[in-house]
């Protein structure tokens, strides 16, 4: 019964995640069940088993898991490089997004259903909003670099979209912990800067204010705190295995939906001892 009900999720997933692709398993499920709305359970199970066993699908599954592992390893190395560069880091973790009334779907609701005008307007509004979301993120990071200069040791961001949460970013910033300790105030100031950059359309949630694990001041030898931080960061990658944003510019160029700062140069290191986790 649950499997047959899940066939109805085909439409809902595409509606709720219009800019996303899914894990190979979900993609196979959607493709197989998309044309089997009137089929029985046994027919669906046989079709799924056959599809999963196909060589091309097997390769896609292996490739997807490999890419996921490589991303996790890259981020793990990045975090370790930041602690090599700085004896302590002030970790700022924010979710930034847009108020409901600024969801790009709002103007589309005023259009008549099933018209060429709606299709064209949807695409135009979608492209315009994507570019705006990208510009506003770039502007936020640019202003933070100007303010903190080299004390902004690193950062990680990920862009997502769903109907419920609109466009939203997970952002983690790493400041020099020897110079900055007041993480709650700094997180709030970055959130307010986001509101300013978005012309009061943006909202934010501070994980520092709510004292999540893996945020605030973390010294290079505080292994448990570092494990919590790494767990938070790697979670962003793990969720991409199931639902991953894919965006393109008007020219068709692929746009980043996940990025990090540069690995600090060896000459920037402020200490020689390296702690492993």
Where are the regions a protein language model picked out?
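Charge-rich, solvent-exposed alpha-helical interaction surfaces
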Residues: 2, 12, 25, 44-47, ...
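Signature for HUH/AEP ssDNA processing cores
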Residues: 76-156
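A short, flexible beta-alpha/helix-coil linker loop
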Residues: 99-103, 174-179
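Catalytic "initiation/cleavage/transfer" segments centered on a nucleophilic residue
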Residues: 17, 21-41, 57-85, 109-115, ...
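Eukaryotic intrinsically disordered, low-complexity regions enriched in serine, threonine, and proline
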Residues: 46-61
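Histidine-centered divalent-metal-coordination microenvironment in nucleic-acid enzymes
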Residues: 154-178
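Structured loops at beta-to-helix junctions and adjacent beta-edge loops in soluble globular domains
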Residues: 95-97, 160, 239
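Long, charge-dense tracts
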Residues: 1-22
